Regions:
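Bacterial peptidoglycan biogenesis and beta-lactam-recognition machinery
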Residues: 81, 116, 164-166
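Disulfide-stabilized extracellular recognition modules
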Residues: 22-25, 137, 141-202
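C-terminal motif of bacterial Sec signal peptides marking the signal peptidase cleavage site
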Residues: 10-13
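Bacterial N-terminal signal peptides that target proteins for export
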Residues: 1-3
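Short, surface-exposed glycine/acidic/tryptophan-bearing loops
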Residues: 96-149, 168
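Post-signal peptide N-terminal segment of mature Sec-exported envelope proteins
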Residues: 22-63, 69
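Bacterial signal peptide processing site
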Residues: 15-19
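A short alpha-helix/helix-coil micro-patch that ends at or immediately precedes a cysteine
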Residues: 51-112
Length: 202
């Protein structure tokens, strides 16, 4: 199941963000006692560990890069989007962490509460979620999907749906953020919940 929404030139509150650069100014203590040489050799290669799980990726490998590659290949080629029309090639979009935050919040909410809609159950629209994530937009759109197991499967579904395809091909959008969340329970309607937010800054 897939759904799309598009909103352009709406009003949105300006959100900002900043970062702190940590500073360190400690001086190591001076030792006058010699340190004994260890008798057990230290391995030069650390013990391999499993890669950390990254939230919002459904544990799919190369999630961000795979999505950007597929989205931008479609945009570079141009596309016929059925009843939404034919779109010429358009510039690539870039990954945006604020849009990803907005997308992830909604994907997680749908996965936890077992629903599928552009509107959150508390009434927030995708444009409100994007604004609340700190992205000041002049154009915004959203694609959602549920049940697709892979990046390729969800991109194929969006590509083959006129409204979703039109969002993917819109020259109005320059940034994208995507999230996938697994169902919170085996009783959920779908196994995975996908959200793609696209936008252009103000």
């Amino acid at each position: 199941m897939i759904a799309s929404a598009l909103l352009a030139l709406g009003l949105a509150a300006c959100g900002g963000g900043g970062g702190d650069t940590p500073a360190s100014g400690t001086t190591p203590p001076v030792s006058t006692t010699p340190t004994p040489t260890p008798t057990t050799p230290t391995p030069t290669d650390p013990t391999p560990t499993d890669p950390p799980t990254v939230a919002g990726t459904c544990d799919l490998p190369n999630f961000k890069q795979d999505l950007l590659t597929r989205i931008n290949a479609l945009r570079a080629a141009g596309a016929s989007c059925g009843s939404s029309g034919t779109f010429p090639a358009v510039p690539a979009v870039g990954w945006n962490d604020k849009l990803t935050t907005a997308a992830d919040g909604h994907a997680l909410d749908m996965a936890n509460k077992n629903y599928f809609s552009h509107d959150s159950q508390d009434g927030r629209s995708f444009s409100t979620r994007i604004t609340n994530a700190g992205y000041s937009w002049s154009a915004a759109g959203e694609n959602i999907a549920a049940g697709q197991p892979t990046v390729q499967a969800v991109m194929d579904a969006w590509r083959n749906s006129p409204g979703h395809c039109a969002n993917l091909m819109s020259a109005n959008f320059v940034d994208v953020g995507v999230s996938c969340r697994p169902a919170a329970s085996s009783s959920n309607t779908y196994s995975k919940y996908w959200v793609m937010d696209l936008a252009k800054p103000r």
